[in-house]
UniProtKB/Swiss-Prot annotation:
The lineage of its organism: Bacteria, Pseudomonadati, Pseudomonadota, Alphaproteobacteria, Hyphomicrobiales. Zn(2+) 2 binds at residues 165, 168, 187, 190. Keywords: Chaperone, Cytoplasm, DNA replication, Metal-binding, Repeat, Stress response, Zinc, Zinc-finger. The gene is dnaJ. Residues 8-73 form the J domain. GO terms for molecular function: ATP binding; heat shock protein binding; unfolded protein binding; zinc ion binding. This is Chaperone protein DnaJ. Belongs to the DnaJ family.
């Protein structure tokens, strides 16, 4: 491209002429990510734009080159020009490599020899409230990828070894130079592994791992809650070609309980009581989560939905010595299917009742009477 058709380097990087180093680098990163060939496969326009961006940044990030460009323009870098002869050599390649390994992860997740960390696995487990209270050790069976014993995870047939890729020299990546521009890509020969397996292991088809059923012991501590996650390090899928294994994550869910509702470390339950017990007072027993019993004393005149607290009868707090409380909510039942004698007794009780025995009802009807009386006036 001749100097007469080249765009201004500042326009190419979309910055002002007085832009400082941080603004240059920020704009360069943004544009480079946008037009990088790996993100725009087959787009020749993006590749040309990407080269222009790198050329502009290579000049403007260097104080001496920038000063020469500001004075002479593109002519400063033509052969025989005021600043010619330097070209874009190793300095550009180094800058490109440093920046784009950071931007696009060119260092990769693979180690030398194509070793890759195994995938993490998830296992969903439902437990009861009683199990969450006391803790338990559970046995689970899961299908996982394990290291192939036939090839010891290498992927090559027994008696053979992988060979270093001749294309990349075992690096897993290759560099392609186009004049001043150097682009680093995944090696097409070994697909980034750095090694070539000419005779694959028949047991694992060269993957270095096979699928097996594995039985694991899972320790569930006291006080776990719905959604608690337990990590078993190294119990995920085996790594590829000798890479480290992934982890296994156990996600716990609590089954609905027939009697208790849980709120953090506290437990709640509803217990029906008779109208007589509510009026005269009494005592009853309720089951506790540890399979015991607790007594609840009901004072005379107890109203429906009143709650009673039983200290330290709730759930243990995970990884703590603290324990929640248990709350018992009483529900006063209205009697049904009364005999004639029972109906007569209740009717007699109603005649004998006064504002002292039913203060809320008396107060309510007094308010209603006052309301309609005020409207009549």
């Amino acid at each position: 491209m001749s100097t007469s058709t080249k765009r201004c380097y500042y326009e190419t990087l979309e910055v002002e002429r007085d832009a400082d180093e941080s603004k240059l680098k920020s704009s360069f990163r943004k544009l480079a990510m946008k037009f990088h060939p790996d993100r725009n496969p087959g787009d020749d326009t993006s590749e040309v734009k990407f080269k222009e961006i790198n050329e502009a940044y290579e000049v403007l990030k260097d104080k001496d080159k920038r000063a020469a460009y500001d004075r002479f323009g593109h002519a400063a870098f033509e052969q025989g020009g005021p600043g010619g002869g330097a070209g874009f050599g190793a300095g550009f390649a180094s800058s490109f490599s440093d920046i784009f390994e950071d931007l696009f992860g060119m260092a990769g997740q693979r180690g030398r020899g194509g070793r890759e960390r195994g995938a993490d696995l998830r296992y969903n487990m439902e437990i009861t409230l009683e199990e969450a209270f006391g803790g338990k050790t559970a046995q689970i069976e899961i299908p996982v990828s394990v290291t192939c014993e036939a090839c010891s995870g290498i992927g090559a047939k027994a008696g053979t070894k992988p060979k270093t890729c001749s294309t990349c020299g075992g690096a897993g990546r290759v560099r392609q130079s186009q004049g001043f521009f150097t682009l680093e890509r995944t090696c097409p020969g070994c697909q980034g592994r750095g090694q070539m397996i000419e005779d694959a292991c028949p047991s694992c088809s060269g993957q270095g791992r096979v699928t097996r059923e594995r039985t694991l012991s899972v320790n569930i501590p006291q006080g776990v809650e719905d959604g608690t996650r337990i990590r078993l390090a190294g119990e995920g899928e085996a790594g590829v070609r000798g890479g480290p294994p992934g982890d296994l994550y156990i996600f716990l869910s609590l089954a609905q309980h027939q009697f208790f509702q849980r709120d953090g470390a506290d437990l709640h339950c509803r217990v029906p009581i008779s109208m007589v017990t509510a009026a005269l007072g009494g005592e009853f027993e309720v089951p506790t989560i540890e399979k015991g019993k607790a007594k609840v004393k009901v004072p005379a005149g107890t109203q429906s939905n009143r709650r009673f607290r039983i200290a330290s009868k709730g759930m243990p707090v995970l990884r703590s010595r603290q324990t929640g409380d248990m709350y018992v909510q009483v529900v006063v039942e209205t009697p049904q299917n009364l005999t004639k004698k029972q109906q007569e007794l209740l009717a007699e009780f109603e005649k004998l009742s006064s504002g002292n025995t039913q203060p809320e009802s008396e107060g309510f009807f007094t308010k209603v009477k006052d309301f309609f009386g005020s409207r009549a006036n």
